[in-house]
Design a protein with these regions (language model features):
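Active-site acidic-Proline motif in GNAT/NAT acetyltransferases
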Residues: 86-91, 95, 107, 123-124
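Conserved active-site tyrosine of GNAT-family acetyltransferases
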Residues: 19, 132, 137
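Conserved GNAT-fold acetyl-CoA-binding loop/helix
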Residues: 16, 20-43
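Acetyl-CoA-dependent GNAT
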Residues: 33-91, 102
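A short beta-loop-alpha structural element at the N-terminal edge
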Residues: 3-15
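Conserved GNAT acetyl-CoA-binding A-motif
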Residues: 109-121, 129
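Conserved acetyl-CoA-binding loop-helix of GNAT-fold acetyltransferases
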Residues: 94-108, 129-134
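Conserved catalytic-core motifs of GNAT/GCN5-like acyltransferases
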Residues: 118-121, 138-144
Length: 144
């Protein structure tokens, strides 16, 4: 069973470890070299549990992934809009955990006052595209 909780500073090393796995695949992030805990500290601290949470996902006490809701575009008109990021440890991928994460987030949105969610997904990341499309998201900005 997956347990969700607000990320604490002591979770940051594992969050960074999972993030760095995605850099190697070139599927999920524009970073091209591994990041450090220090590199992600300001990003971590920008998350507010009441407005822009960062959750960890645990199974049997092990952090297997994380979910971030971040500001979009930084202008007041977008206060009810967030960018979602879901990162899952490579050994736990392709087990339906992304869908569990989507279901969890969907239930949290009303309490956070969020009306619009968007995700930046690389064209090569077909698994993420399918996950979001399956959950009613539309593809925008793709080129032929």
């Amino acid at each position: 069973m997956i347990r969700y909780s607000i990320a604490a500073k002591e979770d940051l090393p594992r969050i960074v470890e999972i993030y760095n796995q995605s850099i190697l695949t070139k599927q999920s992030t524009a970073d091209v070299t591994p990041v450090t805990i220090e590199d992600k500290l300001a990003w971590f601290e920008a998350h507010d549990p009441k407005k822009r949470p960062l959750w960890i996902m645990q199974e049997a006490g092990v952090i297997i992934g994380w979910i971030s809701l971040s500001d979009f575009y930084g202008r007041p008109a977008y206060d009810r809009t967030v960018e979602i990021s879901i990162y899952i440890d490579e050994t736990y991928q392709h087990r339906g955990i992304g869908q569990y994460a989507m279901d969890f987030v969907e239930k949290q949105l009303p309490g956070l006052g969020i009306e619009t969610v968007l995700a930046f997904i690389f064209d090569s990341n077909q698994a993420s595209q399918r996950l979001f499309e399956k959950n009613g998201y539309c593809l925008w900005g793709a080129t032929a």
